[in-house]
Amino acid sequence: MDGLTTEYNYYSNFDYAINDEKIIVNFLEEGEEEPYLEEILKTPFDWTEFDIPPVTETFSESEYKWLDRIRGGEGKKVEFKSTLRYHIHLKKADKTIEHEIAKTISAFLNSYGGLLIVGVDDDNNILGLENDFCLYSKNQEDNFFKAFRNIIKNYFGLGIVAKLNYDIVSVFGKKIFFIDVYESTKPIFVNNYGIKEFYVRVATTSSLYDVEEAVNYVIERWKN
């Protein structure tokens, strides 16, 4: 009896609708001579209508792994870029943004590889690819991939494609673009409108080396 009474009082305190569920009974406590009235539930209360609805949106293990990578921030082998081509302040495609992509890839190639993620800002916030997608009226993903391949072709030539693994993935409802860059077995230069540039990853930045620095680095890096 104590259990049902406790249950009744508990539900009453939380304002559950139990008026139709209660019943008044005569209850004789052991050792007492006179019974007393007690309100209890006729049956154990059904919690079903108060259950929290199940979460219908689920996320894959892969998404959590990507989130962990992003939360880890930038480093010697990880770089984030907000966009592939879109200049957030100018609100249009801009060559300086493309050049930033190219120099990061070059630095990873000339060092020990790395991961470039587009659609994430410097504060590890996932922005998605909508700014880049808005540059195209249709076939947005296809045109995005085409734009990336053109960046590779224009700044490097297609010879480095074998050193890149890239794709678009979804992370908690937002799309990001990753480029997994493998280290190169030879020096790779960025062709910046006829000017050859040599980049190396130093800490969390892609550093431009002058001629003397580049020569010394190449000799040391690929001396075997």
Where are these regions (language model features)?
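Conserved N-terminal catalytic/coupling substructures associated with nucleotide/phosphate chemistry
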Residues: 1-224
